[in-house]
C-alpha cells in the first residue's frame, strides 16, 4: 500500500475524531498512549472511581461502620444501581437487581424461567455456541429441574421450538465472533411457542440498544465489567420483567430476598419486586465501585454509542483490508450492521504470536483459541485514530511472522 493511501486513512481518522460527539468522554478514563481494544473483556477505569472507593473504605466503612447500611445506602444499593443500569438496556425502573456473578444469575434465571413455564414443558434450549459458563449452568439447571437440555444454534431456534420447550437461553452477542443475534425476532418466536426467553447481555449492554421492555424479554442477565466499566469481578445483574416478578421463584432463596430479612423467621417468604433476585449480603465495595463507574454514562444516549460503534468497526475493517495482505486474516464478524456487535473478530492462523506482538507494541486486544483475534471497540474511549493505528500495527506484525496456512 502506498504512503499516500496510508496518509489518507490517517487524515480521515483525525477528521472523524474531530467531529465525534463522544470524543470528550475519553478523558474520563485512565488510559495511556496505547490502543486499548479489550473493553469487551475488561473496561477501562474511570478516573474518578478511586476517590469514590477511597470514601467507601475510609469514611463509610472506616468511620460509619455498621451505620453505613442505612446512612450510606448500602442496603438498597442492589436495586438503586439496577435502576442506573436499566436505561442502558431499555428497561423501566424496578426490574433489575445487581449482585452475584453472571454464572449465578444465569442459574437463577433459567431455573426460575422453567418454573414460570409450568408443567408439561420439559426442554431447555441453549445457544450451542454460547460462552461455556452458560452451557454449564444450563445443563445443571436442566438436571435440577428434570428438563432435557437441547443445544441449538440461534439461527435454528424457531424451528427447534415446540410444545415441550420451557426456556430458551440465548446470547445477544456471540462472545467469539461478535455476531449480534435477533433479540426481537427470537423473543417473539419463543413467546409464540409458549416458552420463556432468557437473554445474556454480557457483550451488548453498554455497546448497543437492547430494548428489554420494548421487545418483551422475560428475564435477562449481564456482567458489568465490560462496556459498563465496573471493574474486575464487578457484580452482575438480573432483569425480571415486572409481569413475572410475582411468579419469580428463585432457586437460591437467601435471606436478602426475604420479605422481612431481619425477622429471622425459619420459613422463607419472598419480597416483592426485583428484590426477589437477591440472595446473600451484597459485595458492597465492588458494588459501589460499579455505581461510581456508571457516572460516565450521564448524558450519553445509547443510540449515539451504537452509531459510533458501527462507524468505528466499519473504519477498522476498511483499514485492515487496506493494510493487511490478502489471505492473512479473515473477518468472522458479520458485515451487516444489524448482525454486528461492538467487536471485530479476525481469523488468523498465527493468532497467538500475533496478539502477543500487538500487545508488546501497545495495541491491546485478545484472542480466543485456536485462531481468533478479538478487537473490542468501546465508543466512550476508543477513537478512529486508535482503529487506524491498530490496523496498521497489525499489518506490521503480520509482515514479520511467516504465514502458516490459509486464514479463511
Which residue ranges define each predicted feature?
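Pyridoxal 5′-phosphate
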Residues: 1-408
Amino acid at each position: 500500500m502506498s504512503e499516500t493511501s496510508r496518509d489518507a486513512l490517517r487524515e480521515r481518522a483525525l477528521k472523524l475524531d474531530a467531529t465525534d460527539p463522544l470524543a470528550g468522554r475519553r478523558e474520563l478514563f485512565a488510559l495511556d498512549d496505547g490502543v486499548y481494544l479489550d473493553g469487551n473483556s475488561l473496561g477501562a477505569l474511570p478516573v474518578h472511581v478511586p476517590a469514590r472507593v477511597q470514601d467507601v473504605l475510609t469514611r463509610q466503612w472506616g468511620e460509619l461502620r455498621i451505620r453505613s447500611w442505612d446512612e450510606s445506602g448500602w442496603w438498597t444499593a442492589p436495586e438503586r444501581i439496577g435502576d442506573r443500569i436499566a436505561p442502558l438496556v431499555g428497561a423501566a425502573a424496578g426490574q433489575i437487581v445487581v449482585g452475584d456473578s453472571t454464572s449465578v444469575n444465569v442459574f437463577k434465571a433459567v431455573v426460575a424461567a422453567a418454573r414460570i413455564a409450568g408443567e408439561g414443558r420439559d426442554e431447555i434450549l441453549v445457544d450451542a455456541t454460547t460462552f461455556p459458563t452458560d452451557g454449564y449452568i444450563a445443563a445443571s439447571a436442566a438436571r435440577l429441574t428434570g428438563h432435557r437440555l437441547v443445544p441449538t444454534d440461534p439461527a435454528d431456534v424457531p424451528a427447534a421450538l415446540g410444545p415441550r420447550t420451557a426456556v430458551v437461553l440465548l446470547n445477544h452477542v456471540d462472545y467469539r465472533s461478535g455476531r449480534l443475534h435477533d433479540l426481537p425476532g427470537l423473543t417473539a418466536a419463543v413467546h409464540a411457542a409458549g416458552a420463556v426467553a432468557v437473554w445474556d447481555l454480557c457483550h451488548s449492554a453498554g455497546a448497543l440498544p437492547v430494548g428489554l421492555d420494548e421487545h418483551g424479554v422475560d428475564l435477562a442477565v449481564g456482567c458489568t465489567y465490560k462496556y459498563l466499566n465496573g471493574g474486575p469481578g464487578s457484580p452482575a445483574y438480573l432483569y425480571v420483567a415486572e409481569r413475572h416478578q410475582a411468579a419469580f421463584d428463585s432457586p437460591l432463596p437467601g435471606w436478602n430476598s426475604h420479605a422481612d430479612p431481619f425477622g429471622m423467621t425459619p420459613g422463607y417468604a419472598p419480597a416483592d419486586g426485583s428484590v426477589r433476585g437477591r440472595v446473600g449480603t451484597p459485595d458492597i465495595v465492588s458494588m459501589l465501585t460499579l455505581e461510581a463507574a456508571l457516572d460516565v454514562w450521564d448524558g450519553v444516549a445509547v443510540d449515539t454509542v451504537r452509531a459510533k460503534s458501527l462507524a468505528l468497526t466499519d473504519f477498522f475493517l476498511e483499514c485492515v483490508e487496506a493494510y493487511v495482505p490478502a489471505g492473512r486474516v479473515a473477518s468472522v464478524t458479520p458485515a451487516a450492521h444489524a448482525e454486528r456487535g461492538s467487536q471485530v473478530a479476525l481469523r488468523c492462523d498465527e493468532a497467538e504470536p500475533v496478539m502477543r506482538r500487538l500487545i508488546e507494541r501497545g495495541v491491546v486486544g485478545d484472542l480466543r483459541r485456536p485462531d481468533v483475534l478479538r478487537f473490542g471497540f468501546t465508543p466512550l474511549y476508543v477513537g478512529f485514530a486508535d482503529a487506524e493505528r491498530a490496523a496498521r500495527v497489525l499489518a506490521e506484525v503480520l509482515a514479520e511472522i511467516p504465514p502458516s496456512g490459509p486464514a479463511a
